[in-house]
Amino acid sequence: MSKVIHVTSNEELDKYLQHQRVVVDFSAEWCGPCRAIAPVFDKLSNEFTTFTFVHVDIDKVNTHPIVKEIRSVPTFYFYVNGAKVSEFSGANEATLRSTLEANI
């Protein structure tokens, strides 16, 4: 069962960014690579239980200042104690996994 939280508002996103360890998947419904990496993101949410996994559809939550920074999808941001510690763009499972491992 997926532990991914699907954020639908700026307020929700702000709340989850304050968790101890967070990975945010910024994506869009129309994005093929986003759809391809989604099952991997779901699977990793069960493996890396110390992280809060958050999904943000940039077309639905599009007024948040962080979302306005996104230039390509999928983009993943990693936060520890409210501070961004890493990011990358692209549907790359190995990079996603290694970045999670580096921030445990």
Swiss-Prot record:
Keywords: Disulfide bond, Electron transport, Redox-active center, Transport. It holds the Pfam family Thioredoxin. One of its GO terms (cellular component) is extracellular matrix. GO terms for molecular function: disulfide oxidoreductase activity; protein disulfide isomerase activity; protein-disulfide reductase activity. It comes from Dictyostelium discoideum (Social amoeba). This is Thioredoxin-3. The active site is at C31 (nucleophile), C34 (nucleophile). The record marks G32, P33 as: Contributes to redox potential value. Participates in various redox reactions through the reversible oxidation of its active center dithiol to a disulfide and catalyzes dithiol-disulfide exchange reactions. Belongs to the thioredoxin family. The record marks D25 as: Deprotonates C-terminal active site Cys.
